[in-house]
């Protein structure tokens, strides 16, 4: 990611730096992988977190670990009732300064099984739009300022055959965030936008029996995602290798791109599969440990994230 620094945003989008005060942050999709690790890190930083997802037991354990920082709600972004539940969560949180959308799904689907393609779109396009729009309207109606962020993907750079619906849905998310930023400027709203585009991250999203090129562990990726959230960068690609690769991808004409075979994964050894399975559960295993003491909490606490040598499962 390179050297980290916070940059001021001039004009109507200038507002208090993320790290200077406690923030009320809603994490949509924070019951596994990136979202869960990020929730732990932000709670340890002293922020108040509204955790939303589908795994109630995970959220309950997270609240036990950080009882003063965490409130939670079971929310499925594909449910029409999700916006109402989000507003209820915001009320219990005491308001919202930051909305961060992590919820997503994806399949390797060369057979083009329609149910899988539509489920991906229902979650990553319809659900994403439903929740991000709700957050935008909330900020518009409550002072006209806030921060909307999302985990999109490097897969949104180009259409990728094996993950057609996934790559298309991520391109939609990136374009939609740009459109909302333009809308915020037209309406003179102080809403900031962050589009975080990771490469492969070892999370439970994909199969443990596969090896993915240039994959990253949660312990490596989450601090970089955290930096991107609090920095002034509009778009952040994680990490530098993927920044270089996607820069090359953009230079390739579509007429040539469609003739290329883009490798997604290879079969992992049995030993590596076991390591992947173990590491994918790392954030959940941490919740089974003892709760942190008061001295471990607050802005000076050491972030609770996976170690850099852990190997959890990839997300594009």
Cite the ranges covered by each PLM segment.
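Rossmann-fold cofactor-recognition segment
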Residues: 66-81
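Active-site helix of classical SDR
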Residues: 132, 169
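Conserved glycine-rich cofactor-binding loop
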Residues: 31-32
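Residue(s) in the substrate-gating loop at a strand-loop-helix junction
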Residues: 153
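Short alpha-helical oligomerization interface
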Residues: 109-122
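SDR active-site lid
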Residues: 36, 182-242
């Amino acid at each position: 990611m390179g050297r980290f620094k916070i940059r001021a945003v001039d004009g109507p989008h200038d507002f208090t730096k993320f790290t200077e005060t406690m923030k009320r942050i809603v994490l949509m999709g924070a019951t596994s992988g990136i979202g869960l690790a990020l929730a732990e890190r932000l709670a340890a930083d002293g922020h108040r977190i509204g955790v939303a997802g589908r795994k109630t037991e995970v959220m309950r354990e997270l609240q036990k670990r950080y009882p003063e920082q965490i409130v939670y709600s079971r929310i499925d972004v594909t449910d029409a009732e999700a916006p109402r539940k989000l507003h209820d969560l915001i009320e219990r949180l005491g308001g919202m300064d930051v909305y961060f959308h992590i919820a997503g799904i994806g399949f390797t689907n060369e057979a083009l099984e329609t149910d899988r393609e539509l489920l991906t779109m229902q979650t990553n396009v319809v659900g994403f739009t439903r929740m991000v729009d709700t957050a935008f309207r909330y900020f518009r109606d409550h002072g006209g300022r806030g921060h909307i962020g999302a985990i999109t993907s490097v897969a949104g750079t180009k259409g990728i055959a094996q993950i057609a619906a996934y790559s298309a849905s991520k391109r939609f998310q990136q374009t939609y965030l740009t459109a909302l930023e333009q809308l915020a400027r037209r309406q003179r709203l102080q809403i900031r936008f962050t589009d975080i585009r990771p490469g492969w991250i070892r999370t439970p999203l994909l199969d443990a029996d596969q090896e993915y090129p240039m994959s990253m562990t949660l312990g490596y990726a989450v601090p970089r995602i955290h930096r991107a959230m609090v920095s002034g960068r509009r778009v952040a690609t994680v990490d530098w290798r993927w920044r270089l690769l996607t820069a090359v991808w953009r230079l390739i004409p579509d007429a040539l791109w469609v003739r290329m075979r883009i490798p997604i994964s290879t079969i992992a050894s049995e030993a590596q599969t076991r390591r992947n399975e173990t590491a994918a559960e790392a954030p959940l295993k941490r919740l089974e440990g003892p709760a942190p003491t008061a001295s471990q909490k607050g802005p000076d606490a050491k972030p609770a994230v996976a170690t850099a040598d852990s190997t959890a499962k990839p997300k594009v």
